[in-house]
Amino acid sequence: MNSDLPAAKPVSSNESMTIERIQGTDGIRGPVCRLEDSSSSNPLDALLNEGVMTEEFFELYTYAYCQELLGADFASAHDLVVIGWDPRDLSGRFNEAAVRGIRKAGLTAVVVDILPTPAISLYQLHVRAACAFVLTASHNPAGQNGIKIF
């Protein structure tokens, strides 16, 4: 263990919640809510201070990742990006927001709708897409969602 790093400080019950790790191995998942239902004024504050992801965060996340692909020359304008999801977002708001982020970045969203995660990553390879997003929280409770990246 590196002794130059500060020790982790536990959050007391009267402090706002902060998350220690934003992204896991292949994405992010956790509780979701509408931004207007949170006490935050923007999606990053909602994530960092309340630990919740909003539909605006889904758009920002896919947009930022696609911009990174473009900036690193792993993708070119209008390249394909596959996106699919599990059935937990009954309103479709989070799914639509993630698709908006891809399109806003200048890439082409190939929407495959509801498919199992392995099928989406295989389809990405089949169509030679720059990347794929799967909107799922896997085995987490229904009030949660997530974004996996392939």
Task: Walk through the language-model features, giving the residues of each.
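An N-terminal, well-structured beta->alpha segment
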Residues: 1-98, 104-105
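Ferredoxin-reductase
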Residues: 70-150
